[in-house]
Structures are given as structure tokens and as C-alpha cells.
Amino acid sequence: MAVHLPSYADYMVASEELEPSLGWSYDGWLGDLAANPEMKSADIAVSMVDRYMEACLSNNPNDYLSLSVIDLSVVPTLLRQVETYSAYLTEALENGQLPTISRARQRMYPFGKFADSSTDMVDFMAFLDATRQFAPNMASQIESTYRTAIHYSLGTDMFDYLTGMSILVPGSNVSEFITSFDEQYDCGEKYPNYSQFTYGY
């Protein structure tokens, strides 16, 4: 989603994990804004994350929670780098590395799994660390850019990886994914190389 927003906003506030039924604490961050109408957009976004976590933890301290602030000005650079990286991953698939990548994917936590509602979204760094062997220098560049893009991030200690942004990596139901991707989610014009990798995988 973040790749579609840089023309429209400075920051994106989003959760990697499913959000609880409690939802966002609007009175919290709106109260902060009312008390300080001169707040910068980045500070408003951080307040959203803080107030969300406070409200959700108060409701259930053992919940699966995450919320991040993404600096959208960095996302176009990140996208270009991921596109280059994806070409290396497709080459790895063509060279017989499907079993390696598939095993790595099965070890990743798909967000929503705790509620049996997985959407094949995994943590960005979990994906990068699992595949960096195929293009280590490019992976290091991506990691540096990614760390810059994550302006702020909070979450509970329920995850092996929770670094601020998720990425779609199809799991066991690849054929089902391809059908739904074609019909509903294909935005390949934004990231053709990554789309090619997911189809090939």
C-alpha cells in the first residue's frame, strides 16, 4: 500500500498485524492535536501510534499489536531497490532455488495467523533476511533505506520479526493467490519485477 501513497501524503500510519476490534484511539491523538494545533504531521502520526498502543494494551496486554509510521518520501527509493532485488530473486528461482526460498517462506510468520486470518503478509525484514544470500550487497542497501523509511514503530513481544512494514509473499496456497491477485490486487505496473517474482515463486 505504501508505494501508492507518496504523491498524496507525507507519512503513512499502518499496522503489520490485524487490528483488534477496539480500533484506533481517536480521542487520544485528536486530544493531542487539539491541545497543540501546530503539531507537525510526523508528530501527529507518532501520537496516533502511541495512543493506539496505550488503548489496546490497556484493553489486552497480551494481544498481537503493531503500528508504525512510514516516511513516504523514502518509499520511491525503497521501491526501486526492491525492484532490482526482485530481479535477482527471479534469477535464483530460475537457477533452481525454489525449494530454498519456499522453505524460508514457510518459516516466516504470516500476519493474521494467530486468528486464522493470514493474508500472506510477512515482515519486510524477515523476508529480506531470508533471501539476502541471493544478492547480499543489494540487500544491505535495501536494509539501510528501509530503516530510514520506518520513522516510528511499536508492537508487542509476540513476534520474531516486527520491524514496521509488511510485504506480500505468497505461502502454501500459491495457485489461489495468483487467481485472487489477478482479479483483485494486480498493481504490477508499480512493481513489475516483484510481481514477476511472486508469480514465479
Question: Where are these predicted regions, by residue range?
Answer:
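Terminal, contiguous helix-loop blocks that mediate binding/assembly
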Residues: 1-201
